[in-house]
């Protein structure tokens, strides 16, 4: 179990403070800059044990790097980074620092995914020769990003989201 005790919840200091207050985070542990948070929390005797990175994809590498260098364990939302070279650099840094780095793959916990994995491992369905997957999510079916919706803006830009959305 984890307790939320600190956070860099927005790059806007007022919004970060308001979000922290809503979540019960002490004002002195509310940050508007992830690098500042990494250094400050690493210096505290009661500093965080781990950070959860749930930023837009293009920020994962920078944020994870700051916390790994500060000696703070990282729980990073998928994808690891927006590019393969960034992922390779991040993996090397995690190995070099020996600081735990874990990548969330949220669907691995779904019963249907676990059952499929079990069936494949046991040979119950034979050799897997082809996999076809559909991910039905209609909120980005139209040009939502044109309305200024923040999530849609970065998720529909391959330069910010990475190329995984196009695979």
Language-model segments: which ranges?
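Short, Asp-centered acidic motifs that coordinate Mg2+ and/or phosphate
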Residues: 6, 50, 130
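Predominantly a Rossmann-like dinucleotide-binding segment in NAD(P)-dependent oxidoreductases
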Residues: 107-167
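N-terminal Rossmann-like dinucleotide-binding module
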Residues: 1-24, 46
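Beta-loop-alpha module in the N-terminal Rossmann-like domain of NAD(P)-dependent dehydrogenases
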Residues: 26-93
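Rossmann-fold dehydrogenase core element
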Residues: 89-107, 127-130
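Rossmann-like NAD(P)(H) cofactor-binding subdomain of soluble oxidoreductases
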Residues: 59, 79, 102-109
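Hydrophobic residues in well-ordered beta-strands that form the structural core
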Residues: 76, 82, 101-103, 132
């Amino acid at each position: 179990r984890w307790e939320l005790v600190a956070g860099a919840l927005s790059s806007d200091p007022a919004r970060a403070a308001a979000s922290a207050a809503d979540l019960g985070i002490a004002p002195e542990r509310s940050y508007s800059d992830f690098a500042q948070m990494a250094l400050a929390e690493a210096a505290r005797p009661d500093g965080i044990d781990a950070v959860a990175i749930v930023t837009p994809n293009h920020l994962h590498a920078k944020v994870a790097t700051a916390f790994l260098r500060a000696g703070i364990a990282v729980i990073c939302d998928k994808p690891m980074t927006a590019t393969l070279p960034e992922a390779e650099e991040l993996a090397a840094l995690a190995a070099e620092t020996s600081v735990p780095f874990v990548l969330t793959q949220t669907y691995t916990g779904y019963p249907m995914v676990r059952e499929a994995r079990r069936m494949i491992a046991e040979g119950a369905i034979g050799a897997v020769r082809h996999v076809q997957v559909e991910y039905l999510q209609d909120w980005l079916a139209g040009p939502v990003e044109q309305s200024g919706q923040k999530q849609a803006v970065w998720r529909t830009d391959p330069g910010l989201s990475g190329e995984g959305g196009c695979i």
